[in-house]
C-alpha cells in the first residue's frame, strides 16, 4: 500500500458552475490543499452561473456563429454591421459579467483593479480578432472556433488567480490554449496526448512555488479541440494530462454534487452516491447521458504509469468522501493509492466485493430514431455501407443500432441538429429504402460491471417497463457487457428512470 506523499502534486479541476456560483469555496479548497501539504494545480472551466446555455462557453459559441454569418454575407454590408453590433453586445455582456464577479468577491483594491484590466484586455483582444476576421474575410473554421472559445477559460483563470492572491496565496496564470506545437496537422496522432502532457508538466513546474491556475482549454489540437473527437468536457482531459505531466497521483473533479450517483439526483430523489465506480462504468454513464468524466480522461488516467486516481467531489461539501474511479482487474493497480478509499471498505478495489446488482441507471435525451428498410435486393453489407456513408457525409454518429439483413434502426443524438438537417438526412436515406423517423425519444441505460453475471436482468428491466406501459422502440445489448439500453418515448423518460431505480436499487430486488 502506498501512502500519500507530503508536498505531492494534486490536479484540481473545477467545473464552470462551481467557479460561477462558488468562487469563494473554490479558493478555500485550493488554499486548504496547499496548507495541508499538497501542491495543487488548479484547472478551470469557463464560468457558468446556471444552465449551460447561459454559460460563457455557450455565449462564445454565439460569437463564433454570428461571426460566421457576418463573413458569409460580404455582399450585404448593412446586415454585416447589424450582426457585428450583436456580436459586440455579446462580448460586452461577457466582460460585464466577469467584471461584476470580480467586484463582488475581490476585497483588495489593487488586485481588483489589476484583474479588471486583464479581463478588459482579454475581451478587447477577442473583439479585435472578430473585427479583423470581418474586415479581411478570414476563414471562420474549427481553429477560429477554438480561439474564440478559449477566452472562457482564460477569464475564469483571471478570476481564480485574483481569488487566491486576495487570500495571500501566491498564484500564477497559466495559459495552455496555444502551447502545444500543432505541426499543421489536421488529425490527432496517437502520441499527441503524451507530448501535450510533457509540455503541460514543464510549463506548470515553471511556476516555482506559486499555485498554477490553468486554462482547461488547451491547444493547439490538430484539426480542432471542439470539433475533433474531444469536444466539450475537454477540461477533464486537461486535468488528467496535467497530472500525467507532473507525475501526480491524484485528479480531483469538483462538481456541485456529492459524487457519481446511481441516477441523476435531480430526477430521482432516492438516488444515492456511489463510493466507487470502475472506469468502464464511468465511461458508459458519460456516453449515455450522465455528465461524469470525459471518456478520454478516463482512458488516459488508467493507461498512465503509474495510473492516476480520479476523485469526484462536491465543492459545497469538500469534507465528503465523494466517488473514486477504481481500476478493474485488467488494469495495472500496483501503484494505485488504495489507501485513499473508504477505510471501512478495504476490499472495495476487488471485483469479488462488488455486489451483483447494477451500478447506475441513466437517461440520454434528444434522441431521434431512423428506421430504414432496404428497397433493393442487394447484399446487406452494400446496404449498410450506403447508409453509413450518408451519415458520415452529415457528420452524424450513431448511439445505438439494431440490424437485420435488410433493415436497420439507429438512435441518433439530435440535440445539435436542426429540423432541416434531419430532413436532409431522411431524404438521402430514402434513396436506399423506406425511412421512418421517430423524434422526441430517449435512451434508457442500465450500467454495471456485474450485469454480465446477472441472469435475467434484461428480462427484469423490460418487464418493469412493460408493467408500467412504457413502450420500447429499440433494444441494444451485446456491444458492451456492462450496459443494457433501450429507446423509449421522451415523455416517459423520467417516469421510467424512477421506476427502474425504485425496483432495482431502492428495493434491492435483484
Swiss-Prot record:
GO annotation, biological process: homoserine biosynthetic process; lysine biosynthetic process via diaminopimelate
Gene3D superfamilies for this protein: Acetylglutamate kinase-like, VC0802-like
Protein's UniProt name: Aspartate kinase FUB3
UniProt family annotation: Belongs to the aspartokinase family.
Domain ACT: 372-440, 446-510
One Pfam family matching this protein: AA_kinase
Keyword Kinase: yes
Organism for this UniProt entry: Gibberella fujikuroi (strain CBS 195.34 / IMI 58289 / NRRL A-6831)
EC top class named in words: transferase
Listed GO MF terms: aspartate kinase activity; ATP binding
Reactions catalysed: L-aspartate + ATP = 4-phospho-L-aspartate + ADP
Keyword Nucleotide-binding: yes
Disruption phenotype: Impairs the production of fusaric acid.
Biotechnological applications: Fusaric acid is phytotoxic to plants such as cotton and banana. It has been shown to induce programmed cell death in plants. In addition to a mild toxicity to animals, fusaric acid exhibits acanthamoebicidal, antioomycete, and antimycobacterial activities.
GN (gene name): FUB3
Record function comment: Aspartate kinase; part of the gene cluster that mediates the biosynthesis of fusaric acid, a mycotoxin with low to moderate toxicity to animals and humans, but with high phytotoxic properties. L-aspartate is suggested as fusaric acid amino acid precursor that is activated and further processed to O-acetyl-L-homoserine by cluster enzymes aspartate kinase FUB3 and homoserine O-acetyltransferase FUB5, as well as enzymes of the primary metabolism.
UniProt EC number: 2.7.2.4
SUPFAM superfamilies, A to Z: ACT-like, Carbamate kinase-like
Keywords in alphabetical order: ATP-binding, Kinase, Nucleotide-binding, Phosphoprotein, Repeat, Transferase
Gene Ontology CC annotation, any one: cytosol
Associated pathway: Mycotoxin biosynthesis
Amino acid at each position: 500500500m502506498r501512502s500519500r506523499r507530503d508536498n505531492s502534486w494534486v490536479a484540481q479541476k473545477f467545473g464552470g458552475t462551481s467557479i460561477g456560483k462558488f468562487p469563494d469555496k473554490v479558493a478555500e479548497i485550493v488554499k486548504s490543499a496547499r496548507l495541508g501539504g499538497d501542491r495543487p494545480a488548479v484547472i478551470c472551466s469557463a464560468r457558468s452561473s446556471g444552465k449551460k446555455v447561459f454559460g460563457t462557453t455557450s455565449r462564445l459559441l454565439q460569437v463564433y456563429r454570428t461571426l460566421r454569418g457576418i463573413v458569409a454575407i460580404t455582399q450585404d454590408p448593412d446586415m454585416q454591421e447589424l450582426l457585428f453590433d450583436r456580436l459586440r453586445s455579446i462580448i460586452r455582456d461577457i466582460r460585464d459579467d466577469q467584471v461584476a464577479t470580480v467586484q463582488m468577491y475581490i476585497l483588495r483594491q489593487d488586485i481588483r483593479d489589476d484583474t479588471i484590466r486583464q479581463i478588459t484586455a482579454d475581451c478587447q483582444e477577442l473583439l479585435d480578432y472578430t473585427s479583423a476576421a470581418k474586415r479581411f474575410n478570414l476563414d471562420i473554421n474549427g481553429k477560429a472556433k477554438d480561439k474564440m472559445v478559449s477566452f472562457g477559460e482564460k477569464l475564469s483563470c483571471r478570476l481564480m488567480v485574483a481569488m487566491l492572491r486576495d487570500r495571500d496565496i501566491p498564484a500564477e496564470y497559466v495559459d495552455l490554449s496555444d502551447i502545444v506545437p500543432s505541426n499543421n496537422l489536421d488529425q490527432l496522432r496517437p502520441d499527441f496526448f503524451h507530448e501535450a502532457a510533457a509540455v503541460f508538466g514543464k510549463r506548470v513546474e515553471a511556476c516555482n512555488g506559486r499555485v498554477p491556475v490553468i486554462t482547461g482549454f488547451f491547444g493547439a489540437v490538430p484539426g480542432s479541440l471542439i470539433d475533433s473527437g474531444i469536444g466539450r468536457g475537454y477540461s477533464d482531459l486537461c486535468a488528467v494530462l496535467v497530472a500525467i505531466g507532473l507525475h501526480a497521483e491524484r485528479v480531483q473533479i469538483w462538481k456541485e454534487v456529492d459524487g457519481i450517483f446511481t441516477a441523476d439526483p435531480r430526477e430521482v430523489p432516492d438516488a444515492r452516491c456511489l463510493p466507487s465506480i470502475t472506469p468502464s462504468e464511468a465511461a458508459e454513464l458519460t456516453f449515455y447521458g450522465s455528465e461524469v468524466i470525459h471518456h478520454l480522461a478516463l482512458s488516459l488516467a488508467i493507461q498512465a504509469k503509474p495510473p492516476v486516481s480520479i476523485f469526484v467531489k462536491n465543492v459545497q461539501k469538500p469534507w465528503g468522501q465523494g466517488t473514486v474511479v477504481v481500476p478493474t482487474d485488467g488494469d495495472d493497480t500496483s501503484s494505485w493509492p488504495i489507501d485513499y478509499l473508504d477505510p471501512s471498505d478495504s476490499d472495495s478495489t476487488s471485483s469479488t466485493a462488488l455486489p451483483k446488482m447494477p451500478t447506475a441507471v441513466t437517461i440520454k435525451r434528444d434522441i431521434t430514431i431512423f428506421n430504414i428498410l432496404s428497397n433493393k435486393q442487394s447484399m446487406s453489407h452494400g446496404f449498410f455501407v450506403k447508409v453509413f456513408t450518408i451519415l458520415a457525409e452529415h457528420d452524424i454518429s450513431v448511439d445505438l443500432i439494431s440490424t437485420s439483413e435488410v433493415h436497420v434502426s439507429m438512435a441518433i443524438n439530435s440535440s445539435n441538429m436542426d429540423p432541416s438537417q434531419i430532413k436532409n438526412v431522411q431524404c438521402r436515406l430514402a434513396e436506399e429504402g423506406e425511412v421512418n423517423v421517430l423524434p422526441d425519444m430517449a435512451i434508457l441505460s442500465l450500467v454495471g460491471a456485474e450485469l454480465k453475471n446477472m441472469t435475467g436482468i434484461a428480462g427484469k428491466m423490460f418487464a418493469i417497463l412493460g408493467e408500467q406501459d412504457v413502450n420500447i422502440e429499440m433494444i441494444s445489448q451485446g456491444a458492451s457487457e456492462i450496459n443494457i439500453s433501450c429507446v423509449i418515448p421522451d415523455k416517459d423518460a423520467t417516469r421510467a428512470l424512477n421506476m427502474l431505480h425504485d425496483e432495482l436499487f431502492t428495493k434491492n430486488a435483484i
